[in-house]
Structure formats: structure tokens, C-alpha cells
Amino acid sequence: MENGTYFIISSNFWTIAGSFGLNTNLLETNLINLGVVLGLLVYFGKGVLSNLLNNRKLTILNTIQDAEERYKEATDKLNQARTRLQQAKQKADDIRINGLSQMEKEKQDLINAADEDSKRLEDSKNATIRFEKQRAIEQVRQQVSRLALERALETLKSRLNSELHLRMIDYHIGLLRAMESTIE
């Protein structure tokens, strides 16, 4: 039975629903009712719509203002970063230039030190050569003197007799007396 009631309701419903539709004839529609409804919508909806639009406008303006502030901050940070980068580049260039000049100075100092060491070694070598030359000359002189004395002694021994020996002694005694008298 219940199925039958549903069927009856359902068939009535479908007959009523079939009568709904869109009437496109403007003359048959109730323009006054529509005007009143639209007027009420505009009158009461104007405040709500105005508030919604104002809120949306304020939200958009705040978003734009925030975006502009973030853009300004980002631009400032970018400029600061560029300035720091430029300073870092300048400092790196200064360090590089100072390093190159320091390297040239060290190189020149090493060259000068090597030249001085070379000159000292040359002077030392020359002094050693002069010393060895003087020593060799002195040794030759001593040997020549020794040999000359040996020959002179041999010659004197071979030629010296007692008479010549006495004359030489007298001669040297006379020389010593002459020296003694000049001293006094």
C-alpha cells in the first residue's frame, strides 16, 4: 500500500513539475514584480556588495602595498649585496695587486741577496787566492833564502881560511863599535 501512495504522490508531483518553465514573453511576465525584486536586491544588496567590494579593494591594496614593501626591501638588499660584492671585488683586486707587488719585492730581494752572496763568495775566493799566493811566495822566498844561505855557507866554508876569518871578525867588531858610538 505504501508503494501505491508513493506512486500517487509521485504522479501528482510530476504533473506539477511539468508545468514549470521559463516564460520568455516579456509581456506575459510580471515586470513589476521583477522590478520590485530587483530593486529590493539592489537596495539591500548594495550595502553587502559595497562592503564586499570595499573589503576586496582593501585586501588588494594591502597586498599591493605589502608587495611593494617587499619589492623595496628586496631592491635594498640587492643594492647592498651589489655594494658588498663591489667592495669584495675591490678588496680582492687590492689583495691581488699587493700580492703581486709583494711577490716582485720578494723576488728582487732574493735576487739582491743572491748577488750579495755571490759577491761575498767571489771576494772570499779572491782573498783565499791572494792568501795562498802570498803563502806560496813566502814559502818560495824562505826556500830561496835557505838555499842561498846554505850555498853562502858552503862557499864561505870552502873559501874561508883563518886569516880571512880573523879579518871578518875584526870588521864586524868595528861595525859594532861604530854603532855603539852613534847610539851614545
From Swiss-Prot:
UniProt keyword Metal-binding, yes or no: no
GO molecular function: ATP binding; proton-transporting ATP synthase activity, rotational mechanism
Cellular component, GO, one term: proton-transporting ATP synthase complex
Entry-linked Pfam families: ATP-synt_B
Subunit structure: F-type ATPases have 2 components, F(1) - the catalytic core - and F(0) - the membrane proton channel. F(1) has five subunits: alpha(3), beta(3), gamma(1), delta(1), epsilon(1). F(0) has four main subunits: a(1), b(1), b'(1) and c(10-14). The alpha and beta chains form an alternating ring which encloses part of the gamma chain. F(1) is attached to F(0) by a central stalk formed by the gamma and epsilon chains, while a peripheral stalk is formed by the delta, b and b' chains.
NCBIfam families linked: PRK07352.1 (NF005606)
Name this protein carries in UniProt: ATP synthase subunit b, chloroplastic
Organism (species): Marchantia polymorpha
Taxonomic classification: Eukaryota, Viridiplantae, Streptophyta, Embryophyta, Marchantiophyta
